């Protein structure tokens, strides 16, 4: 019984072979889904997904003490980030020292670990440069919990791109420590009310875990006491499952929303999930040529827009990585068939 339940909760969307393990994997093998091409007639409206979490930091989350104008122009964003970096350096390194923001970010997370933070993969901050032979250079930084940020300025050198990514990541890391960033009863009520207003929902939906907003409330309550960055890391898994069509497939396999939430609330985003989703996009591309390139172009635009706005990027970055993995698998298949 437990084995069958675990199989039904696999993140795949397979069509056909309903009782097989492959049909329950994260991908969407077989006929393409609406993400690849619209059906001939109007598609049935799927049950609403869980509303997204309250926006992080620079998107103006409720209760967050942002520097004045932090959500405004790029110039104001730069000024706000610099102010937070200087403030952090003043309190940790004293006056008169030049700020090495890359070292400061690493020091921040090592300090959190030394104070008892549960960092399952250690306190190492990881940087990734986008390959390029000319400016502007782009760098991404992944924090120990999985949150991702990127250089938000025009960077003429690779070193400057690294510093830019470190600055926005440090700002978010510091702000995430503020009490207003913790999920409390008051925060839950405010977030659910905002979700109801955004989705034109009613109060009964918020109390029903089988609705999207009810599931959102359930997730918030299950993560009470955690910070918003920690919650965003969890939500990334569900965002990817929704994007790939996996949540819809699980509903078709008679998985309850509570089962899905309980299962994936404790499962980290891993290479198995990425690989299975990539296989789905290989299948989509084979069924509808051009589907992969269109999705990749759209994802790259979204990633660049979010990066330049100083937003958390993991969802967009994971989407791009999955699509690039699919493109690589297609290339290997073409090479082997020649």
UniProtKB/Swiss-Prot annotation:
Upper taxonomic lineage: Eukaryota, Metazoa, Chordata, Craniata, Vertebrata
InterPro entries per the UniProt record, alphabetical: Autophagy-related_EPG5 (IPR051436), LIX1 (IPR029270)
Name of the molecule in the record: LIX1-like protein
Cross-referenced Pfam families: LIX1
Biased composition (Low complexity): 29-38
Gene Ontology BP terms: autophagosome maturation
Species annotation: Rattus norvegicus (Rat)
Residue segments, region Disordered: 1-65
One GO CC term, this protein: cytoplasm
Family, as annotated: Belongs to the LIX1 family.
Residue ranges with Pro residues bias: 39-56
